[in-house]
């Protein structure tokens, strides 16, 4: 078993832990580091397509905010969370994408006058929608059977 702390190891935001065990690789949360340039978030040490699934502890953006970016970059596995967490994530991720798009548009309008290069949003509403389609809601304290021998207890 290998545990790699990828986020929130030097501050509170940006929670992300990668666990490799029983031939599987998964993330526990994939959150946005808040209060800094969004493009400076911790990169993953593996390609998103090499991650089997994601387990979400709760819906806060510092635990879920990079899931649309994960989907945009090729992750196609399942994202497991309790049903209320899935519902909240749908709202929060779409809202975050809207903010990303609005801020990029604003920076581009402002930067155009100064001759700055255009910026792209970190992710779009379409990316948030793609991430939301990967969610699988589970009952609180239910056993999630991923594959043999991987089983997890839902606690979010």
Task: Write out the residue ranges for each language-model feature.
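Acidic/polar short surface loop at catalytic or gating sites that assists cofactor/ion binding
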Residues: 90-135
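Hydrophobic/aromatic beta-strand patches that form the interior of the parallel beta-sheet core
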Residues: 4, 26, 55, 80, ...
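Divalent metal-coordination and catalytic microenvironments
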Residues: 3, 29, 58-59, 89
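Active-site metal-binding motif and surrounding structural segment of the metallo-beta-lactamase
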Residues: 37-88, 94
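Fold-independent oxyanion-binding glycine-rich loops
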Residues: 8, 30-31, 83-84, 138-141
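Single conserved hydrophobic/aromatic residue that forms the stacking wall/gate
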Residues: 144-156
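Short Pro/Gly-enriched beta-strand edge/turn motifs at strand-loop
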Residues: 1-2, 125, 136-138, 147
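Conserved beta-strand hairpin/beta-sheet module of binuclear metal-dependent hydrolase folds
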Residues: 1-49, 53
């Amino acid at each position: 078993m290998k545990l790699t702390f990828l986020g929130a190891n030097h501050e509170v935001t940006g929670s992300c832990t990668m666990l490799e065990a029983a031939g599987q690789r998964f993330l526990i949360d994939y959150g946005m580091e808040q209060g800094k340039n969004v493009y400076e978030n911790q990169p993953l040490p593996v390609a998103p397509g090499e991650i089997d699934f994601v387990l979400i502890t709760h819906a806060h953006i510092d635990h879920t905010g990079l899931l649309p970016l994960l989907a945009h970059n090729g992750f196609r596995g399942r994202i497991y969370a309790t049903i209320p967490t899935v519902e909240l994530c749908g709202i929060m991720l779409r809202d975050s994408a809207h903010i990303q798009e609005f801020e990029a548009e604003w920076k581009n309008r402002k930067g155009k006058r100064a001759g700055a290069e255009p910026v792209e949003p970190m992710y779009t509403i379409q990316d948030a929608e793609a991430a939301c389609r990967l969610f699988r809601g589970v009952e609180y304290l239910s056993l999630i059977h991923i594959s043999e021998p991987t089983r997890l207890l839902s606690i979010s």
